[in-house]
Regions:
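Terminal amphipathic alpha-helical/low-complexity segments used for targeting or macromolecular assembly
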Residues: 1-60, 138, 156, 173, ...
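A short acidic, helix-capping loop that chelates divalent metal ions and anchors anionic groups
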Residues: 122-124
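Left-handed beta-helix
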Residues: 64, 69-70, 75-76, 83-84, ...
Length: 180
């Protein structure tokens, strides 16, 4: 509903449980990824053509001829799919609490943020309200654009620089975490 705001008069963050969010791997694997990411993956000296292989080691499904610049952050590689012939620009952030699926020939430019996570503003506990993101073949997420949870970027779509793209009514309804 356009212009609709959800107002919660009393927030009770102490009751936050994180229900419905599965990191997808045990803590030792998470720790190994964080160490590897911070010590090598994001560094300028780590070759861009090696980054896809390192993501694959940690469970990502990465296609051929993928070019990933330095300072690209990936929360959980095992929740990431990247098709062939994609470019991911410097300082992009793939915040994949839920899966991010990037089709072939996609350009994600410098400083872009793809964030599958959110919170339920109507819930006093502020529980998660996450949903996957899909990016269609040939799309371009321009510099410093933000793509929010539940969005489906159409094939060939351009998300202009500095804009925010959220799920629209035509996008799949994001699933509410922890609801029955």
């Amino acid at each position: 509903m356009k212009g609709h705001r959800t107002v919660v008069t009393e927030r009770a963050l102490r009751t936050f449980s994180g229900r419905g969010y599965d990191k997808g791997r045990p803590k030792p694997v998470q720790a190994a990824w964080f160490a590897t990411s911070n010590l090598a993956f994001v560094k300028w000296w780590f070759p861009p053509r090696w980054r896809p292989g390192l993501l694959r080691v940690f469970g990502a499904d990465v296609g051929e001829r993928v070019f990933i610049r330095h300072r690209v952050r990936v929360l959980w590689p095992w929740k990431l799919t990247i098709g062939d012939d994609c470019w991911i620009g410097e300082d992009a952030w793939l915040l994949d609490l839920e899966p991010i699926a990037i089709d072939h020939d996609v350009c994600i430019s410098q400083g872009a943020l793809l964030c599958t996570g959110s919170h339920d503003a109507a819930d006093p506990a502020f529980e998660y309200d996450n949903a996957p993101i899909t990016v269609g073949a040939g799309a371009w997420i321009a510099a410093r654009a933000t793509v929010l949870r539940g969005a489906r970027i159409a094939p060939g779509e351009v998300v202009p620089a500095g804009t925010v793209r959220r799920a629209s009514r035509s996008d799949a309804t994001p699933r509410r975490q922890g609801s029955s």
